[in-house]
Amino acid sequence: MAYSLEVAENLNKVFGKLAKKDKVTFEAINKKVKEILENPYHYKPLRAPLQNKREVHISGCFVLIFKIDEERKVVQLLEFDHHDRALK
């Protein structure tokens, strides 16, 4: 069963800017989100202090961090940033 999607408010702004300025990265994110919704447990779980979250790399050095709410069958997109900033 596929999961539904929730996007953090701060990501809506980031994705809006990417849709206008960097369509290649925006399309890469869309493709990866579709894959995540089909099988979210395929992607790397993070360690403390980011436990219960997972990451997927997009366009090399950028990561998308998400959380899975199994009870509601929802994937929550939390953060998209450069690897060094996102995992601090």
Locate each region found by the language model.
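Enriched for short, Lys/Arg-rich terminal
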Residues: 2-5, 16, 20-26, 58-63, ...
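A short, surface-exposed loop/turn module that caps and links secondary-structure elements
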Residues: 31-57
